Amino acid sequence: MSQNPLPPSRSYDLALRNFRLQAGLTPQELDELETTTLEDLQKALATMQTKQQHTKKLMYLKRLQPFLDAMEQYSTVINIFVNTSNLLAFVWGPVKFLLVTTSNVSEVFNALLDGYRSIGEQMPLLLQYRDFFDSNQYMQKALASIFEDVLEFHLQAVQLFKQRSWKQLFHATKQSLIRKVNDVADSLKRHRAFMQSQASLIQYQEFDETRTYMKEKFAKLQHQERDIRYRRVQEWL
């Protein structure tokens, strides 16, 4: 049996605090991220698209659209329950940072777009459930879990692409990033099924236990991969 989950507002606060502490961003970068709006992201995407047209390297940015659509609906619903004006900046900001950073490396840029498409296609479209959130605390807690899942993906990706040597590291860490995408997509698929059932206490406990187990399993795999990479470096030296 999993422990009692935190109240939704507390879950958001802890997720944001963890991201700020572990992302490896400078204070200036964090300030920019925390003030990023969807409009800012869309302007950056338009600039990237224009540049790609000029260089004849158009890379189908519409792959990002399912994710953006789902997160827009998320924003509409979550504003009813959480008094955090900059919450979605921690979605739009990392997307902008990651795509701007990798826009000149086609393989990496495409991998990120594919990842966002996979995540976006599994996200529940929340407006159809909005009448249930107000009266169902377990649905509200599931909303917080969705944000945590997306932010965990962004944390791992930002940690990688913030490093100066990310172009060299990408191939060594690509499979780990793909696994994280799949992990988040699977979790969001469970969120969607959970919301369709309109969430009883027993269902929430089962859902939360499964989510905790999968997160622990993924963390163990990450640790094993780091050990393997470290040993390979030592052998090379």
What do the predicted segments below correspond to?
Residues 76-82, 102-105, 130-141, 199:
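Acidic, serine/threonine- and proline-rich low-complexity regulatory regions
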Residues 3-6, 118, 127, 138-237:
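Regulatory helix-to-disordered linker/tail regions at the edges of structured cores
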